């Protein structure tokens, strides 16, 4: 005789998360990490941008509750991702803001929510001479924090990217130039000819693969162009790098890098200068985080430089006021 299927339980299920914990201590962040999602963001008059993204989603938790309702986090992420596909959200940092706001609605006990998104973005590029098409992976970071108030939530958001490029060391290049100058003088070459030669053919130096990071934090109503951030990162190193290079391309890339030697410090300062000119419409309290890591070729260590400041602080320093502390 076949066994009758069990009927689903129709009674009220216990809400264990809502019970009181044994230790009544507030928790700063409770949530889920590494939630992998496919993100599609529509753009006006352009193809949609598709990201493979990892989300970290948190809420704060009062000491009176044993646990947070984590399933609500997944529901909110999926709802906002659908809004992005439908065109209601058209920037990835706004996507994080939308998730953070909805989390406050769903977690009525929370006063603070936080959403982080780490993505990889494929950028199509052309090599400088042969114009061969290749692709580059750019790491994209977005974050939003929402805080409950008696009125509307206060939301701060940030958008950033990490780009790989090439740097040429100015120190070693000047050492090599001084040596070459001495040799050429010994061969009877006049200084004017020597200077003309160096202007066309820069001296050799050791190189680094550089990783630049730039992130801008603003209020929720401000717009920060991700493509402009990526462009600033690329232009702040000695030269770009490519997955595929023909011989002519390789010559052009190496020449460009050696004509534009930069220390790791130079890269960070150049980024800061370009941010001030490229995002001059942002308020002075916008926070900029700039990092550069150069993987040395003739040393066993990496070179590193960093700056974190408001736009107002950077502008004051560029204008000659160096009293602001880093």
UniProtKB/Swiss-Prot annotation:
Cofactor: Fe(2+)
Record key words, sorted: Hydrolase, Iron, Metal-binding
Gene Ontology biological process terms from the UniProt entry: tetrahydromethanopterin biosynthetic process
EC number: 3.5.4.39
Annotated site residue numbers, May be catalytically important: 169
Co-factor binding details: Binds 1 Fe(2+) ion per subunit.
Catalytic activity: GTP + H2O = 7,8-dihydroneopterin 2',3'-cyclic phosphate + formate + diphosphate + H(+)
UniProt cross-references to Pfam families, sorted A to Z: GCHY-1
GO molecular function terms attached to this record: GTP cyclohydrolase I activity; GTP cyclohydrolase IV activity; iron ion binding
Pathway in which the depicted protein is active: Cofactor biosynthesis; 5,6,7,8-tetrahydromethanopterin biosynthesis
Group of enzyme by EC: hydrolase
Function: Converts GTP to 7,8-dihydro-D-neopterin 2',3'-cyclic phosphate, the first intermediate in the biosynthesis of coenzyme methanopterin.
Assembly, per entry: Homodimer.
Protein family (similarity comment): Belongs to the GTP cyclohydrolase IV family.
Protein name per Swiss-Prot or TrEMBL: GTP cyclohydrolase MptA
Species, as recorded: Methanoregula boonei (strain DSM 21154 / JCM 14090 / 6A8)
